[in-house]
């Protein structure tokens, strides 16, 4: 029996008036650092100011103070998000054709931006249908608004104003919880309470309130919209909420109220909580009744999950106990000590969250097209392509961020003296085996995946198609993927007897959903071409992981530099006296990892874009004949490198290259400009600091001659700064180029 001393009933969890609000201090650049606060001597000062402004670890070593700054900054972030959302809704209310789109979503394109004629750029206002001229948008907001039950621009105005009020509230909260009532460290470390509140509150009640909104507002309004009722004739949301008889006309079970719920006769509610699977043939989106059911189920799960952890009542799980019990036969002390790491190192915590959120974002990308959740989303090809591309890039960046913060944790927060034989220590002790094996896997994947393409290019060049790897010659069918597809396609009659159709049309079966003569979704065939490109995916992902993991595992020490931890997270080289020690810092691994992340995601979005245009997207005739945008050329063209260059990059770039003089010309200019930004990055990546310092000193000499030399001494960028500027422009230029290429193409042909 464990006897615990009685704890005081009320814990004081905040400090009052912790730090005074001082505009004078905020107005002094670099007030958070003694060195920076002195002001600039050289131009390096402005770079250090940006690098360290949010590096709270460098301001103080007091964990409580760091925690408060991070917490306060989160409210600032939320404020910006609300401001951004407000802007999106305001554009929908003020500058868009939302009401026209709502009345005819198959013939009218979504637009929420009208360009003002200043120097003739009103050419950008294309005809999106219904007599409206503006820029076609591909964010998916219109489809989201329709699914939420928004029927007028006035409702968008009200939401925009509401979001502005919330933005102001968040700004106030950020100030209040740092200056007026700052939480104590114990509050940030009370993980059980945090889990309960986040699970039950954010996820549980959040899902429940969304399910409630869907049932009482979205479902009835969408029911009317689908039946072709004029949006102006549809009752307003509060009428559905307050008048049960109105809902009962659409969903008879509403007449019975809550009786079926308390008598456990839940199947009565199956008229608005369904389990159908597949897509609604009217809108090409998931059944909104399925979505409502899903959110209700999720809410129940998370409300239960939010009552599992031990807080004031002495029952439930303790996270420390769970982690310390977590050990297997070959894992030594297992997760012992992990609780302390995750409650004292916010970098470790953030790393874990970024890895999870990044993976989840990529999962979202894949579900948005295979199970399109909003009405008329699946037939808006530009939006589909944009949503996939956007979520893939974001996921890639978040995963690299996970490695970055894992490495910062290793350098700044990891204490090797207190860790022995737990899982992390054991991983670090056999890091050589991990990295060398991973390196072997990368070499194997690289040579074999690329080798298959090179073989095909060679055979194609020699005029020997019968010797190529293709669906019509030597087949390399992705049999495991096809088996998984088939299993899911057959699920409704086997493992999921309650469902009418399988979760996604992409699995297989004969179903095709078309809306307004355009294909929403159909079974996606996988063949040799997909087998080849999937191994390129495997290769690029493994190389990215190799670089990032090496950075984390060797962040503190390596055979080359045993005292690396003393040099910090980012440093250019191990001092001037040691050659061959550049690009070894943990920061440099993140820098290099970003390039491979860019490679990996580029191949994924290229694969997706071409595959969908070739095998899914297109029009359907009255006889039911489908004509795809690129006529199914993916299977035979994408099996050679030449095919990718000729039939994808070059053939599909014609729209962006020929966009001048049309409403798509902005994409042509972006395509050009973003190429320029990308090329500009190479100047930073391929030249050293000394070259620029020499040039600068010559320019300073000229300024002195003319007596216009500045007081602040100009300096070349440091090595690390140059790399940071380089990789930023490389990624920005590359992503913007791809964006212009994709959108000009898909808006023109989609």
From Swiss-Prot:
Catalyses which reaction(s): reduced [plastocyanin] + hnu + oxidized [2Fe-2S]-[ferredoxin] = oxidized [plastocyanin] + reduced [2Fe-2S]-[ferredoxin]
The residues that the entry says bind chlorophyll a are 683, 691
One GO term under biological process is: photosynthesis
Similarity field = Belongs to the PsaA/PsaB family.
Task: Give the membrane topology, semicolon-separated if more than one.
Answer: Multi-pass membrane protein
Q: Which controlled-vocabulary keywords does the entry list?
A: 4Fe-4S, Chlorophyll, Chloroplast, Chromophore, Electron transport, Iron, Iron-sulfur, Magnesium, Membrane, Metal-binding, Oxidoreductase, Photosynthesis, Photosystem I, Plastid, Thylakoid, Transmembrane, Transmembrane helix, Transport
Q: What is its EC number?
A: 1.97.1.12
Q: Which Gene3D superfamilies match?
A: Photosystem I PsaA/PsaB
Main location as per UniProt: plastid
Please state where this protein is localized: Plastid, Chloroplast thylakoid membrane
What is the organism field in this record?
A: Daucus carota (Wild carrot)
Q: Which residues bind [4Fe-4S] cluster?
A: 573, 582
Specify the enzyme's EC class, one word: oxidoreductase
Describe its partners and assembly state.
The PsaA/B heterodimer binds the P700 chlorophyll special pair and subsequent electron acceptors. PSI consists of a core antenna complex that captures photons, and an electron transfer chain that converts photonic excitation into a charge separation. The eukaryotic PSI reaction center is composed of at least 11 subunits.
Q: Which GO terms describe its cellular component?
A: chloroplast thylakoid membrane; photosystem I
Q: What does this protein do?
A: PsaA and PsaB bind P700, the primary electron donor of photosystem I (PSI), as well as the electron acceptors A0, A1 and FX. PSI is a plastocyanin-ferredoxin oxidoreductase, converting photonic excitation into a charge separation, which transfers an electron from the donor P700 chlorophyll pair to the spectroscopically characterized acceptors A0, A1, FX, FA and FB in turn. Oxidized P700 is reduced on the lumenal side of the thylakoid membrane by plastocyanin.
Q: Where are the transmembrane segments?
A: 70-93, 156-179, 195-219, 291-309, 346-369, 385-411, 433-455, 531-549, 589-610, 664-686, 724-744
Cite the binding residues for chlorophyll a'. Answer: 675
Identification of the protein by name = Photosystem I P700 chlorophyll a apoprotein A1
Query: InterPro entries, per this entry?
Result: PSI_PsaA, PSI_PsaA/B, PSI_PsaA/B_CS, PSI_PsaA/B_sf
Details of cofactor binding: P700 is a chlorophyll a/chlorophyll a' dimer, A0 is one or more chlorophyll a, A1 is one or both phylloquinones and FX is a shared 4Fe-4S iron-sulfur center.
Q: Known Pfam families for this protein?
A: PsaA_PsaB
Q: Which GO terms describe its molecular function?
A: 4 iron, 4 sulfur cluster binding; chlorophyll binding; electron transfer activity; magnesium ion binding; oxidoreductase activity
For binding phylloquinone, which residues are annotated in this chain's numbering? Answer: 692
């Amino acid at each position: 029996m464990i006897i615990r001393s009685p704890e005081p009933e009320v814990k004081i969890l905040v400090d009052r008036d912790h730090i005074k609000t001082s505009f004078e201090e905020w107005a002094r650049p670099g007030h958070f650092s003694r060195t920076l606060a002195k002001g600039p001597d050289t131009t390096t000062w402005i770079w250090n100011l940006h690098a360290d402004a949010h590096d709270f670890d460098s301001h103080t070593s007091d964990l409580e103070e760091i925690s408060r700054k991070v917490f306060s900054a989160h409210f600032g972030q939320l404020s910006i998000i609300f401001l951004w959302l407000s802007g999106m809704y305001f554009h929908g209310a003020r500058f868009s054709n939302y009401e026209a789109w709502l009345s005819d979503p198959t013939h009218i394109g979504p637009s929420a931006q009208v360009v003002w004629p200043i120097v003739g750029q009103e050419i950008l206002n294309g005809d999106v249908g219904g007599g409206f001229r503006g820029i076609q948008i591909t964010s998916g907001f219109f489809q989201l608004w329709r699914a939420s039950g928004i029927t007028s621009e006035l409702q968008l105005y009200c939401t925009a104003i509401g979001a502005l009020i919330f933005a102001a509230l968040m700004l106030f909260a950020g100030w209040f919880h740092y200056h007026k009532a700052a939480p104590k460290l114990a509050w940030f470390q009370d993980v059980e309470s945090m889990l309960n509140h986040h699970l039950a509150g954010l996820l549980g009640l959040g899902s429940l309130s969304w399910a409630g909104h869907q049932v009482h507002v979205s479902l009835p309004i969408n029911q009317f919209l689908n039946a072709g009722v004029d949006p102006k004739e549809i009752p307003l949301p509060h009428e559905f909420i307050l008048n049960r008889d109105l809902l009962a006309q659409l969903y008879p079970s509403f007449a019975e109220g809550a009786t079926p719920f308390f008598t456990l006769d839940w199947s009565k509610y199956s008229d608005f909580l369904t389990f159908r699977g597949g897509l609604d043939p009217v809108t090409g989106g998931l059944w909104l009744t399925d979505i409502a059911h899903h959110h209700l189920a999720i809410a129940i799960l998370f409300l239960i999950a939010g009552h599992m952890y031990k807080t004031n009542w002495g029952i439930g799980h303790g996270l420390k106990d769970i982690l310390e019990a977590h050990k297997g036969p070959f894992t030594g002390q297992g997760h012992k000590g992990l609780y302390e790491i995750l409650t004292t190192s916010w970098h470790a915590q953030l790393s874990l969250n970024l890895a999870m959120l990044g993976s989840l974002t990529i999962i979202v990308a894949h579900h948005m097209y295979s199970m399109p959740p909003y009405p008329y989303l699946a037939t808006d090809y530009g939006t589909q392509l944009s949503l996939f591309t956007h979520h893939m890039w974001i996921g890639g960046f978040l995963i690299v961020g996970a490695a970055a913060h894992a490495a910062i944790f290793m350098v700044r927060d990891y204490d090797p003296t207190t860790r022995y034989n737990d899982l992390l220590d054991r991983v670090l002790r056999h890091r050589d085996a991990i990295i060398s094996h991973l390196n072997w896997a990368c070499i194997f994947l690289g040579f074999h995946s690329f080798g298959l393409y090179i073989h095909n290019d060679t055979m194609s060049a020699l005029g020997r198609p019968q010797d190529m790897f293709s669906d019509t010659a030597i087949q390399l069918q992705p049999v495991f993927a096809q088996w998984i597809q088939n299993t899911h396609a057959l699920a409704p009659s086997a493992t999921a007897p309650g469902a009418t159709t399988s979760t996604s049309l992409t699995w297989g079966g004969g179903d095709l959903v078309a809306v307004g003569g355009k294909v929403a979704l159909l079974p996606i065939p996988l063949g040799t071409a997909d087998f080849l490109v999937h191994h390129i995916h495997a290769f690029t992902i493994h190389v990215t992981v190799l670089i990032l993991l090496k950075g984390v595992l060797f962040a503190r020490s390596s055979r080359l530099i045993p005292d690396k931890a003393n040099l910090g997270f980012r440093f250019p080289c191990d001092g001037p006296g040691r050659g061959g020690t550049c690009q070894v810092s943990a920061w440099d691994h993140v820098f290099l990892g970003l390039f491979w992340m860019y490679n990996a995601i580029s191949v994924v979005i290229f694969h997706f874009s071409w595959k969908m245009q070739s095998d899914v997207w297109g029009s359907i005739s009255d006889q039911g004949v489908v004509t795809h945008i690129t006529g199914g050329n993916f299977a035979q063209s994408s099996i050679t490198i030449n095919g990718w260059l000729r039939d994808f990059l070059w053939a599909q770039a014609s729209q962006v290259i020929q966009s001048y003089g049309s409403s798509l010309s902005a994409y042509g200019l972006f395509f050009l400009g973003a190429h320029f930004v990308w090329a500009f990055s190479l100047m930073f990546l391929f030249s050293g600091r000394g070259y620029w310092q020499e040039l600068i000193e010559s320019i300073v000499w000229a300024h002195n001659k003319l007596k216009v030399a500045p007081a602040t001494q100009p300096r070349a960028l440091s090595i690390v700064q140059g790399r940071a500027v380089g990789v930023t422009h490389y990624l920005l230029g590359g992503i913007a180029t791809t964006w212009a290429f994709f959108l000009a193409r898909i808006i023109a042909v989609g």
